[in-house]
């Protein structure tokens, strides 16, 4: 289980103590919509009264999510299912976060070059927007998330190259949420594209997998690496000048705010839901300039 979710769990536990309510945190052992559904059905059968969920396959889980929403207050966090009957989404603008990651890579590669995108899966709402944000920065497109919400078919295709004047995105490789597959795909990519100049790892375990592949190939500091989330390997690589930076969410707040909102809803306070049905927990870019202070703060949240 990614550190990201352990930090989110710490936020849930803190909120459960503050609001004196019982909270269970369920983390499926694999990133599978089938396993997720089974785990959720099992816990619903125990008589829970509300749920915060990060849908693994938003488009294909709508009917099932709606069936849950008919039984109890249901909110989404981290990844959204905007077409479902969820009451609110707690998380960040993944498109803006993707753009922040793209900016890190662009700054590290002023001459441009070939870039590889690595991500767990593209069925999730968060991953689609995150990937597109990176692409649009490298392609010099001045857009916001609304462009894609209004034109859901405008996302770049997942196959083939995407080119601008100086950047070529050679491919988007997926690993279905498996770090060992992410490592293998990164190693293979370094052989397939020997002229590669940059890599963006868009799920928590992707930057460490890419880092290991670069280290094994003797290409650290030769190929720029930008990432997502706060894995210790990623933060150490930033500190050592071997990773240009990472875009971090605030999983502690995802957990804390999810419990707070569900508690308010169960108390009958529907005013807790904003008109936008979106509670924004803004992302941050972590680079060599601020990695030390951020890491100290992270250790405090994790109780280390």
Predicted regions span which residues?
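A residue-level marker of the well-folded mature domains of exported/periplasmic proteins
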Residues: 1-304
